[in-house]
Amino acid sequence: MATQKELDKTYMDMAIAMSRLSKGIRAKVGAVAVTKNGVVVVGVNGLPKPLGNELEDKTYTIISKFGENAKLVCDGLKSKNTVIHAETNLLVKCAREGVSMIDSTVYTTLSCCEHCASMLASVGVKRVVYLDEYRCTKGIDVLKQCNIEVEKFNG
């Protein structure tokens, strides 16, 4: 029988593989949920199908302005408000298929935002294992406040 460390590595490898399917430029995030009954559900960050595959909008800065004319430079990308995070996508799949997330473990390539952390807590997730830490760690705080085990993967 596999050890917990071996299982963690296997499921994190799956989350990493799923992240490669994301069409995001700024962030490619994959998530895998393993229920207490061994059901595996996956998700990636993306848009609802009718909205296409462009997850980001370009951001611009005015570098000079002469009268009515302005010279702009593209200075980055910002995720669209309609992007569905990987954790939310897998929860949507669970809801559609009638899969319970009570006492499940979620493996994600990027630690949760506050919103996703709240959703995971609401459906009864027991444990979250993440690969990289998101720049804002409030999601980790929410998980801990909800008595969910949180681990940084060190496989």
Residue positions per predicted region:
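Zinc-dependent deaminase catalytic domain
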Residues: 1-155
